[in-house]
């Protein structure tokens, strides 16, 4: 049924049938994507929500008129359930930075793609908002108290309660309201992409292109920065995150003055909020819909939460207490231990025999260090040093 409808659109647009139609993998949404191979090759989309489809179709045309890199939509069905758009290829930014994500060591090419992407964001937020009719946005036209509390309760019901934790709902709701008040201090008329992260950026000709922006609305600039730089599985080291923040602020100054102290102070509240929002999504898509990608992302988001809570949020005392307890649950601490690489360095004397392999796998490395003097034989004393100290590297 879906492929037949997409084929009709393809024929109406090109005058001939596609050579082949292949369904593409989907992730979090209920939209289905197909590649219609032919001359030209196009992407066909089938979406169950007409309102969401219309939001995308309107925004795609609006952004193209503003010169932003988004796929062109060529034809749509009369009921707006199906449409054909430009094929941007298969290269997601998420995949392009795979080596860095897995090692936390990002090469220069990966960093350059990230710089280009984060510097593009202010253009989306400001130029994208210029002349936009926000009434097309779905399900909300703007970032407001109602949408904030929706997301916080999404976290509460789809993730927090799913862990079996006990908590006082009235005290938690009090802190939710405080958070909404803090986040709304930063109201603005800019476009908030809402899900600006490396899975929603494609790389074509070494340049970033934007997809999946149909959930966008009017809102503050901080949310998208938090979404991108604190994406759970992106695994950006803090040094790279700070570098990209500077790139963003530099690009932002083209559109408005920036008080950096206020910017950073406000951003950390959005980072906490976004982390809770994605945990809610991971809970629903992973625990309830059983989608493996979302289940696999939970430990990374929990680790983000651990790092965030190292600095206090005095505005939300009860919420932070519950979040700390959440990060200490056995199911998350056990998973953290599984993901940590443990390297043990020991020494032994051959005259006592080869030591027992405690791992049971027979692996490892043995280095013959008999020609190396013991540090204790040097005139300079090294007894005050420990392995984590820089000077100890010289031994």
Describe the residue ranges of each PLM region.
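Glycine-rich, flexible N-terminal cofactor/catalytic loop recognition
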Residues: 339-381
């Amino acid at each position: 049924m879906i492929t037949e409808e997409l084929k009709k659109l393809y024929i109406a647009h090109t005058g001939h049938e596609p050579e082949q139609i292949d369904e593409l993998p989907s992730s979090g949404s209920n939209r289905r994507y197909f590649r219609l191979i032919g001359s030209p090759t196009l992407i066909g989309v089938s979406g169950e929500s007409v309102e969401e489809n219309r939001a995308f179709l309107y925004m795609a045309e609006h952004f193209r008129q503003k010169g932003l890199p988004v796929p062109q939509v060529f034809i749509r069905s009369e009921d707006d359930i199906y449409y054909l758009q430009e094929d941007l290829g298969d290269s997601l930014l998420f995949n392009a930075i795979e080596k860095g994500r897995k090692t936390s060591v990002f090469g220069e090419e990966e960093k350059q793609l990230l710089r280009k992407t984060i510097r593009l964001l202010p253009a989306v937020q400001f130029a994208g908002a210029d002349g936009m009719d926000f009434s097309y946005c779905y399900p909300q036209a703007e970032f407001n108290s109602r949408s904030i509390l929706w997301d916080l309760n999404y976290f509460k019901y789809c993730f927090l309660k799913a862990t079996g934790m006990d908590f006082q709902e009235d005290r938690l709701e009090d802190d939710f309201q405080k958070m909404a008040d803090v986040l709304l201090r930063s109201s603005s008329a800019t476009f908030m992409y809402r899900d600006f992260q490396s899975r929603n950026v494609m790389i074509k000709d070494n340049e970033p292109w934007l997809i999946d922006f149909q959930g966008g609305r009017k809102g503050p600039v901080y949310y998208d920065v938090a979404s991108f730089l604190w994406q759970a599985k992106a695994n950006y080291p803090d040094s790279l995150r700070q570098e990209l923040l500077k790139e963003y602020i530099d690009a932002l100054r083209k559109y408005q003055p920036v008080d950096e102290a206020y910017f950073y102070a406000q951003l950390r509240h959005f980072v906490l909020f976004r982390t809770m929002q994605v945990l809610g999504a991971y809970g629903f898509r992973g625990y309830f819909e059983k989608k493996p990608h979302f289940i696999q992302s939970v430990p990374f988001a929990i680790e983000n939460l651990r790092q965030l809570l190292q600095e206090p949020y005095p505005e939300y005392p009860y919420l932070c207490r519950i979040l700390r307890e959440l990060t200490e649950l056995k199911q998350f601490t056990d998973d953290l231990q599984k993901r940590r690489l443990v390297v043990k360095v020991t020494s032994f004397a051959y005259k006592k025999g080869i030591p027992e392999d405690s791992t049971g796998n027979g692996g490892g490395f043995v280095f013959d260090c008999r020609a190396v003097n013991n540090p204790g034989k040097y005139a300079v004393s090294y007894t005050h040093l420990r392995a984590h100290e820089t000077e100890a590297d010289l031994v």
